[in-house]
């Protein structure tokens, strides 16, 4: 499988589908290693989609002596896109730090960006989000991965979905499994999330931008996503009124795909 020596680490990536180039990034996990099935259905039919492992996740290495910052993770992606000779790329950030990486790329290398999508995002942490993310990290450190996993799943899914799917969400092969036995990486990912701050630079983003607001998201809901819509010139905002932190279930996924593909088709 492809790896590249990027920004002083070995960076694992995969490319799926064909068409106009797009990058899809999530939170503290990966769309690689079979997880491409979690991409928006039909995305790889219309686009050549790059997915990759963040530093310390999956098959990507990391240097713990390098200060973790969103700018570092964004520079990894920038150098990977340059390595692949990709430009004019749709940046799709979903449910966490992938959104923040997209913001930094759009600000620092606008030549690479055709459009940007953010969902489950923030421009900077208010005290509430800061304490939430820090608490997730502390629970992992002090109580172990499985307790952390359960704690975050309860925050991330609607009660009805959690009740019906708890057996699939939890356990060694469940959600955020990339962080099992990998607290050091989680610590660094959270540090980058806590210190991320593009609030005063949002106006420099020129790429067409879609901000999706998840009305029932208890982590990164409209409180943290609306400032992005307000701060980015010409940004389009759409609210999914019955969605929590993670888009889950057939109906929500269909609604999300309709919103996403409608935006991409215009740009």
In which residue ranges do the predicted regions lie?
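Short beta-strand/loop motif that positions the catalytic acidic residue
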Residues: 205, 211-213
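Conserved alpha/beta-hydrolase catalytic His-Asp/Glu region
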Residues: 127-129, 147-196, 200-201
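Flexible "cap/lid" loop of the alpha/beta hydrolase fold
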Residues: 103-107, 114-143
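Acidic catalytic loop of the alpha/beta-hydrolase fold
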Residues: 216-220
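Catalytic histidine-centered segment of alpha/beta-hydrolase-like enzymes
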Residues: 243-257
